[in-house]
Design a protein with these regions (language model features):
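Conserved loop-alpha-helix segment in the C-terminal half of the alpha/beta-hydrolase fold
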Residues: 106-145
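Short aromatic-enriched loop/helix-cap "lid" or pocket-rim segments at secondary-structure transitions
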Residues: 28-33, 121, 145-146
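Post-His helix in hydrolase/transferase enzymes
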Residues: 143-158
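Helix-rich cap/lid subdomain of alpha/beta-hydrolase
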Residues: 20-74, 79-89
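Short, well-ordered alpha-helices that flank and scaffold nucleotide-derived cofactor binding pockets
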Residues: 8-12, 125, 152, 156
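Active-site nucleophile elbow and catalytic-triad environment of alpha/beta-hydrolase enzymes
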Residues: 81-99, 113-118
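Conserved hydrolase catalytic core segment
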Residues: 1-30
């Protein structure tokens, strides 16, 4: 959504937009997520508090993502524990329905089939003329697991004149 806002407010700087893994939800869905995730949480005092981060980063990792890389992702997530509320707050308070339709640049949405599959599809529908490419074989860890697949779609799109 940061790319959307930059493109809308500074169209002279943004020639094309490539989006992927978009956490877009309708107003009710955003409010529910903001209420749940937008408040600073106290530092965890048990593993149970961070278990979901571990499951996502390590246990659900793509088979092509090394344990070392997955563990690093987990540590990064844990280190940002209290900062996550500000990130989620910005994402879930962003007026996407108002801003996305203002995009005038060619837009490509790559859609891996992880947990943001449906939200990404819905966001693409807000953008007039957006191209949506489904990537059903990709789910998580896509930058590590399939950079060549992403590049095979991104390069031709970004290199167009």
């Amino acid at each position: 959504m940061l790319a959307t806002e930059l493109a809308v407010t500074h169209p002279e700087l943004v020639r094309r937009i490539l989006l992927m893994g978009i956490p877009y939800y309708d107003a009710e869905g955003r409010q529910e997520r903001f209420d749940r995730l937008g408040q600073v949480k106290p530092w965890p005092d048990s593993f149970a508090a961070v278990a979901q981060d571990w499951i996502f980063a390590v246990e659900m990792r793509n088979e092509k993502v090394s344990l070392e890389r997955a563990f690093g992702n987990y540590l990064e997530s844990a280190g940002a524990w209290q900062g996550k509320a500000r990130i989620y707050g910005a994402v879930f308070q962003y007026p996407a329905e108002e801003r996305a339709p203002l995009l005038t640049q060619p837009t490509l949405v790559l859609n891996p089939h992880g947990n943001l599959k449906e939200p990404s599809r819905a966001y693409a529908e807000l953008i007039d003329g957006a191209t949506l490419i489904e990537l059903p074989d990709l789910k998580y860890g896509i930058f590590d697991a399939a950079p060549e697949v992403l590049a095979s779609h991104a390069r031709p799109f970004l290199n167009q004149r």
